[in-house]
Amino acid sequence: MMDVSGVGFPSKVPWKKMSAEELENQYCPSRWVVRLGAEEALRTYSQIGIEATTRARATRKSLLHVPYGDGEGEKVDIYFPDESSEALPFFLFFHGGYWQSGSKDESAFMVHPLTAQGVAVVIVAYGIAPKGTLDHMVDQVTRSVAFVQKRYPSNKGIYLCGHSAGAHLAAMMLLADWTKHGVTPNLRGFFLVSGVFDLEPIVYTSQNVALQLTLEDAQRNSPQLKVAQAQPVDPTCRVLVVVGQFDSPEFHRQSWEFYQTLCQGEWKASFEELHDVDHFEIVENLTQKDNVLTQIILKTIFQ
């Protein structure tokens, strides 16, 4: 399953020994894109997301801007298959953007291929920095998952997928205390795509200007530091950790070490390095039904 020959497999230099410039470089995904310049890669990603969302809203049965809480921006977009039923698998997506950019309104990449196969897709908005704190984002995402379970109690499984910062937020749901939400979500799978799971390095990069994370904040919100001790809600719930070949060495290290930590616990974890894709293509390609990751997601849901 794993091929370690990719250009970005973990650096032999521990991040704490890197220069400030190198650490910044490692945690700037657009600098590792080989097919386009950094700025163009970001523009292309946004454009593909906007086009996919516009198409999904125009052609799929949907409920848009549904509030899952009372806070500003606490909304989800729900896209349904043609067959009307509440007994569906639900796929929740949390966008990336280093917890400070991105939007549900440009993140419906996977709606067409998944709804075509009978999966409801929920694109989740959360309050990004600098207005929103990371603790609050984690709370929002937790409430969005509880909301879907309460609204669709006859679901055939809830699957959480996050990209980059969104993968971190999805991973935090492995640690969630559902008792205070009055519901235990029917979590059946996690897809953690090019994520960051130990937030300590972020404290020392320019990304922290908006986030304003203290070391304590970073540690409290690092699933890498906590997941080994957590008990799986359901030992059959699958956790897939995915990274792109052209992700940076630090992104590779983060994903590989998180996978290893999951394995040390009782989690049903697997790891995939996807060939010939970068940090952005890995999600852009979810618009395609024959894409490797799209197929992995569908097989996991319908196995």
UniProtKB/Swiss-Prot annotation:
InterPro entries recorded: AB_hydrolase_3, AB_hydrolase_fold, GDXG_lipolytic_enzyme, KFase_ver/fungi-typ
Top-level taxonomic group:
Eukaryota
Please tell me whether the keyword ATP-binding is annotated for this protein. Answer: no
Question: Which Pfam families did the record assign?
Answer: Abhydrolase_3
The enzyme's E.C. designation: 3.5.1.9
Pathway(s)? Amino-acid degradation; L-tryptophan degradation via kynurenine pathway; L-kynurenine from L-tryptophan: step 2/2
Main localization, broad class = cytoplasm
Q: What is known of its domains?
A: The main chain amide nitrogen atoms of the second glycine and its adjacent residue in the HGGXW motif define the oxyanion hole, and stabilize the oxyanion that forms during the nucleophilic attack by the catalytic serine during substrate cleavage.
Known function:
Catalyzes the hydrolysis of N-formyl-L-kynurenine to L-kynurenine, the second step in the kynurenine pathway of tryptophan degradation. Kynurenine may be further oxidized to nicotinic acid, NAD(H) and NADP(H). Required for elimination of toxic metabolites.
Name the UniProt record assigns to this protein? Kynurenine formamidase
Natural source organism: Homo sapiens (Human)
* High-level lineage: Eukaryota, Metazoa, Chordata, Craniata, Vertebrata
> Gene that codes for this?
AFMID
